[in-house]
Amino acid sequence: DEKRLSRLIANLDILTGVPANILDVTGRDIRLFSGHPPFCRAVNACPEGHQRCVACDAWKVGSYRGDGGFQYYRCHLGICEALMPLYSKDQPLAWLVFGCYLDESPLEEQWARTRTRLDWWPGDVEELHRAFLQFRQYTGEELRAYAETLESLAAYIRLEGMIQSAEQSDLQRLERYLDQHYMEKLSLAPLSRQLH
């Protein structure tokens, strides 16, 4: 239910100021959130920057090694982000991400790390530096509290069935068949053909 998901993501940003988003199973942004910080908007406005961000999203999904909770990392430019799968049974259907923040280490150190990764940037690095300084910094305690809140939200998303697999289970196919044929005389042969 894209509309409800979009509203939840927007509400999180309003309440916390921390951008959250949903990526599809391959790590592609499904465009539920458009309020990225100025630094990220500037990088994404550059074709090479956008390509690097897309590749980074795919990388973080492919390298997830968590236990179902959030895995924290720094993106290709050193900005802090976190990722967790939204499961159906044992398979991720989508990914819940939050990020575009800085940790509590000194800003100068974080900028120095980012600056070393900008040799490809075609524009004025000082403009990016000014945008970088607009990132909010969060303590570990704040991030844990936010992650716990998002984990509860992830459980709600699963419970409400807001994200569905395109592939239907046997039970879902059976329910659909019964819904469509409830007025007919049922027998096992046609039912079995429909399920397999």
What do the PLM-derived regions correspond to, one by one?
Residues D29, K89-L93, L186, L195-H196:
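Solvent-exposed, well-ordered amphipathic alpha-helical segments
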Residues E2-I79:
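Structured interaction and signal-relay segments at domain junctions
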